[in-house]
């Protein structure tokens, strides 16, 4: 039996290409003094690791590597912690299943 070597998610994400819509991010974290449990969950739940804690203890998002999977939308949009919309036409991720 021939077993294929496993490939890390990060290695697969490397092949994707992105057309960033500068000045029009499709995800925004709303201003907060302390992060909600939902925002803290995004630090680990986002498969592209777009969310991080800054030096002031606030959650920030970098949409440049977003794969538009909707995980953050399901977790944090219902609570009002983020604003999420589809990228404008022609912008966003281009999957390259490498």
From Swiss-Prot:
A single GO molecular function term of this UniProt record: iron ion binding
Alphabetized UniProt keyword annotations: Electron transport, Iron, Iron-sulfur, Metal-binding, Nitrogen fixation, Transport
InterPro entries reported in the protein's UniProt record: 4Fe4S_Fe-S-bd, ETF-QO/FixX_C, Fd_FixX
SUPFAM superfamilies in the record: 4Fe-4S ferredoxins (SSF54862)
GO biological process terms, semicolon-separated: nitrogen fixation
Gene3D superfamilies linked: 3.30.70.20
Keyword Metal-binding listed: yes
Limits of the 4Fe-4S ferredoxin-type domain: 57-87
Family: To ferredoxins from P.putida and C.tartarivorum, ferredoxin I from A.vinelandii, ferredoxin II from D.desulfuricans.
Known role: Could be a 3Fe-4S cluster-containing protein.
The name this protein goes by in its record: Ferredoxin-like protein
Gene: fixX
